[in-house]
Amino acid sequence: MRLPLLVSVGVLLVALLPSPPCRALLSRGPIPGARQASQHPQPLSFFQPLPQPQEPQALPTLLRVGEEYFLRLGNLDETRAAPLSPAASPLASRSSSRLSPDKVAANFFRALLQPRRPLDSPAGPAKRGTENALGSRQEAPAARKRRSQEPPISLDLTFHLLREVLEMTKADQLAQQAHSNRKLLDIAGK
């Protein structure tokens, strides 16, 4: 009875006691691109309240693009305001400077969020930009007519295809599980 109590009290003391700051972090100079609150970081005690930042930090946003997830820190409205090309950036006038990581990330996400056009489209790059800006409000009448002539897809066919895809993925998962089980048994058997 006393031994588990002493062990748990010891673990709590070790976990709650303030530890000295990491020397590697204190001795290293400022990291380029990182924001420093002060020139000389002071070690924080566990019982000291955390310093409040001057501006509220934005929570990370998880963007889903296709099957991949991208983590974006900061305001998502900045991505729309950021220039897409480095030549349009105010930093491009200085030849020795590079884009900040925030601007690079903003350009990346802005490029991802732009609508895609097929490569064989007759519109040139300048016209594509204006069409993207206008949106799909002004569709060609021929495209509307062609779409109205196509028969709608049957819901039965859609659900049948969905069922087949689900069965195929389930069979694939079972095959992968059997393969990993076989590997584990081979390792354990040796």
Swiss-Prot record:
> From start to end residue, where is composition biased (Low complexity)?
41-53
Q: Which residues form the propeptide?
A: 25-147
Pfam families, per database record: CRF (PF00473)
Tissue expr: Produced by the hypothalamus.
Choose any GO biological process term that the UniProt entry carries and state it.
negative regulation of epinephrine secretion
Q: Does the keyword Secreted apply?
A: yes
**Where the protein is mainly located, per its record?**
secreted
GO MF annotation list: corticotropin-releasing hormone activity
- Give the record's GO CC terms: extracellular space; synapse
- Chain positions with Alanine amide modification: 188
Reading the lineage from the top rank, the first entry is Eukaryota
Query: What does the UniProt entry say about where the protein is found?
Result: Secreted
Region named Disordered: 33-53, 115-151
Q: Where is the signal peptide?
A: 1-24
- Keyword terms of this UniProt record: Amidation, Cleavage on pair of basic residues, Hormone, Secreted, Signal
Give the record's subunit note.
Answer: Interacts (via C-terminus) with CRFR1 (via N-terminal extracellular domain).
* Annotated family: Belongs to the sauvagine/corticotropin-releasing factor/urotensin I family.
What does this chain do? Answer: Hormone regulating the release of corticotropin from pituitary gland. Induces NLRP6 in intestinal epithelial cells, hence may influence gut microbiota profile.
Task: Identify this protein by name.
Answer: Corticoliberin
